[in-house]
Amino acid sequence: LVKLDQSPYKEFFILKGGFLLSATYGLDVRATRDLDTTIRGFSLTEDKVKEICQFIEQPSANENFQFTVRKIKAIRNHFDYQGYNIKLHFQLGRGKFPIEIDLTTGEELLPISKTEDIPLLFSDRSVQFYVYPLKQIFADKLYIILVYAPFDFKISRLKNLFVIFFFSKLNN
């Protein structure tokens, strides 16, 4: 998030999914290694994704970490909207950690005007990003389970069902 916060693309990223729920509500039991985002404001092409990756890989002057892009893959072949999965290595000192970023576009969105303070994992700082409304996250997960699960069983994975369960407890 630090790199995206420093990027010229920051205003186009909308955070969503399990990472957002974990960061916002401190859901340690729903550990996630990927960052789900929706892009608005520009056309999401492979060239644009490569451009974003080049920025992410650039060393930061004041930071002691490095990102290396391992793979970029088109995703969402059965979906109504396109996307890309970026596999990265995050290197902090001698430790190397796999991270994934999913970039999607084209979803029908509720109005997005809210930013959220997202605490950073290896720092006492936080960054602000636009975020999906909770209703949008719930609707997306329910839609994915009901519509796409017949095509791909992995889509109805436990993590999507957990989000539905979480919302049922949140509203009690």
Residue ranges of predicted features:
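Compositionally biased terminal segments of proteins
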Residues: L1-N172
